[in-house]
């Protein structure tokens, strides 16, 4: 299995054990603790795990990545894109699985929102949005956090009559009330 941005080890280990999977690779998008907090414990539990990260992600990576790198595991190859803005060294992983594009974009882009600018710049974030916007429309986006409903509530506090946001919030709340995710988008 490949794990992206393990903020905690325990839920990952529980999932792997429940589904009888072996962790072989960890990929990180950026250095914030809620994305790398479980890396060390996962490496202890699965010592053969291959860690893929940018040099500024504060982990001891086996493979250093940058914009344009390619990473692979279990027959899946991903293009690495620099999508800085939230942080100065934020990476995304773009996979093509059976003709369907999948983008793991960390905190650069959320459903109905984006990550705050910390060590990056607003100009970098804008360039990253333009780059991500160039992906095919049918690309599935996997943001790192499930903030859809809260982002839509915030949007509605600014534009309370926005019918598209109202409808999207109803759908998001229905999905989460049933125990389902609103992601990917």
Question: Which residues fall in each region the model found?
Answer:
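Short active-site oxyanion
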Residues: 1-2, 23-25, 138-140
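Generic enzyme active-site microenvironment
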Residues: 3, 105, 143
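Short beta-strand-to-turn element immediately C-terminal to the catalytic PLP-Schiff-base lysine
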Residues: 4, 94-96, 155-156
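Active-site HxH/HxHxD metal-binding segment of metal-dependent hydrolases
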Residues: 6-82, 101
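Active-site metal-binding loops of divalent metal-dependent hydrolases
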Residues: 6-8, 31, 56, 86-87, ...
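Ligand/cofactor pocket segment of small-molecule handling proteins
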Residues: 70-82, 87-122
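Accessory terminal helices/loops
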Residues: 127-140, 147-185
């Amino acid at each position: 299995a490949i794990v992206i941005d393990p903020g905690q080890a325990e839920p990952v280990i529980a999932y792997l054990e429940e589904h009888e999977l072996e962790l072989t690779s960890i990929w990180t998008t950026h250095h914030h603790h809620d994305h790398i907090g479980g890396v060390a414990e996962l490496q202890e539990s699965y010592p053969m795990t291959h860690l893929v990260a940018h040099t500024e992600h504060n982990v001891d990576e086996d493979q250093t990545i940058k914009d344009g790198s390619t990473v692979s595991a279990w027959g899946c190859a991903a293009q690495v894109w620099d999508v800085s803005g939230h942080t100065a060294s934020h990476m995304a992983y773009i996979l093509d699985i059976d003709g369907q594009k999948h983008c793991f974009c960390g905190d650069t882009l959320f459903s109905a929102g984006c990550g705050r600018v910390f060590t990056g710049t607003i100009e970098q974030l804008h360039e990253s949005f333009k780059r991500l916007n160039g992906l095919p429309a049918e690309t599935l986006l996997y943001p790192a956090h499930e903030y859809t409903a809260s982002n839509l509530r915030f949007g509605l506090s600014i534009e309370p009559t926005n019918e598209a946001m109202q409808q999207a919030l109803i759908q998001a709340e229905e999905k989460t009330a049933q125990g389902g995710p609103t992601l990917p988008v």
